[in-house]
């Protein structure tokens, strides 16, 4: 099975971020989620044995995307195909008891989002440390400040770094707050009542206890208590808008660098062998700044699109303003 490379992943993302959203790793994450539920269901008295759990654990990393794709062509259902594949590998049929597809996929997506945001928080902190070094290094490097893009008053290059750092720190505070309160969806079933889970476990109390255990296992402090088949898409909007906010400081600073580079005030530098143009190899383009601004443009577009997601009518009841789950 061939996978078309994602341009953003190959040009922008770190290896850690690519691995987090890799299709194989996502399937492994789903399997870990199933196994976690299996163990909790066994504790609750469901007919699941240690041998059943062990059978699944032994094959958790055996992911064959081509085989799953073949199953999906028959079932015409992505989650059912992955269930059948995992059952076939383990030689058992114990996973997904009392669950609907979104009990799996919505929680996994929130886990991925949380982990991705944690990576961005880590890189943002690293960026702040680098900015601090340059603030000190260039605190007495004087230059002409500009207003309306014309010469104004004297400032320093260190001040430019400090302004970027101040905005990034403010944005990072908002990101940190979002990460801390980001919830799991929980095991709410097709319409949000958790009826299948209650029926299999015996009571609402037992289901709530299981949801709390799952949240703890995957590092979440919160689980949504009243939700439909999907978690509120306003959460997605908030996540994307926070990403745009994080990108704002680097993008603003990158724009300043490009403007200053155009008048010869600063330069990103020029590595050995680097060229600025196939026709004019001497050109010293602000390549990194251009890439930063390119990502910011994309994030502005994604934020605009995310505005259309945060109305969440009951799935499959009427036309939705987002891609349908079967797509």
Regions found by a protein language model. Name each.
Residues 321-327:
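Hydrophobic alpha-helical segments, chiefly the membrane-spanning helices
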Residues 171, 230-302:
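Glycine-rich anion/phosphate-binding loop at the beta-strand->alpha-helix junction
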Residues 301-312:
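Long, amphipathic alpha-helical stalk/connector segments used for oligomerization, subunit docking
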Residues 310-316, 327:
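Conserved small/polar residues in nucleotide/adenosyl-binding loops
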Residues 159-259:
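Internal metal/ion-chelating core segments
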Residues 39, 216, 255, 294-297, ...:
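Generic alpha-helical structural context detector
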Residues 1-194, 206-213, 276-277, 287-293:
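A helix-coil-helix interface module used to build multimeric assemblies
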Residues 37-38, 113, 117, 243, ...:
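Buried hydrophobic packing segments
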């Amino acid at each position: 099975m061939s996978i078309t490379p994602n341009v953003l992943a190959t040009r922008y993302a770190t290896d850690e971020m690519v691995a987090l959203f890799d299709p194989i790793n996502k399937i492994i994450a789903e399997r870990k989620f199933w196994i976690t539920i299996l163990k909790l269901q066994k504790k609750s008295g469901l007919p699941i044995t240690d041998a059943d759990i062990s059978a699944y654990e032994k094959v958790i990393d055996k992911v064959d995307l081509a085989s799953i794709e073949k199953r999906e062509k028959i079932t015409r259902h992505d989650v059912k195909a992955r269930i059948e594949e995992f059952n076939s590998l383990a030689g058992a049929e114990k996973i997904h008891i009392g669950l609907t597809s979104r009990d799996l996929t919505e929680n996994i997506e929130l886990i991925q989002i949380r982990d991705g945001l944690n990576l961005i928080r880590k890189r943002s902190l690293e960026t702040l440390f680098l900015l601090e070094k340059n603030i000190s290094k260039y605190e007495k490097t004087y230059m002409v400040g500009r207003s309306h893009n014309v010469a104004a008053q004297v400032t320093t290059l260190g001040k430019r770094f400090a302004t970027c750092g101040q905005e990034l720190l403010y944005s990072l505070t908002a990101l940190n707050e979002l990460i801390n309160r980001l919830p799991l969806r929980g095991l709410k079933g097709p319409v949000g009542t958790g009826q299948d889970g209650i029926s299999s476990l015996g009571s609402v109390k037992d289901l709530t206890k299981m949801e709390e255990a799952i949240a703890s296992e995957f590092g979440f402090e919160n689980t949504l208590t009243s939700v439909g088949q999907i978690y509120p898409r306003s959460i997605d909007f908030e996540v994307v808008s926070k990403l745009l906010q994080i990108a704002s400081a680097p993008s603003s600073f990158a724009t300043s660098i490009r403007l200053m580079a155009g008048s010869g005030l600063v330069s990103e530098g020029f590595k050995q062998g680097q060229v600025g143009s196939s026709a004019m190899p001497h050109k010293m383009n602000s390549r990194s700044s251009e890439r930063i601004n390119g990502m910011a443009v994309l994030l502005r577009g994604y934020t605009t699109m995310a505005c259309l997601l945060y109305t969440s009518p009951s799935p499959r009841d009427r036309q939705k303003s987002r891609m349908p789950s079967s797509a």
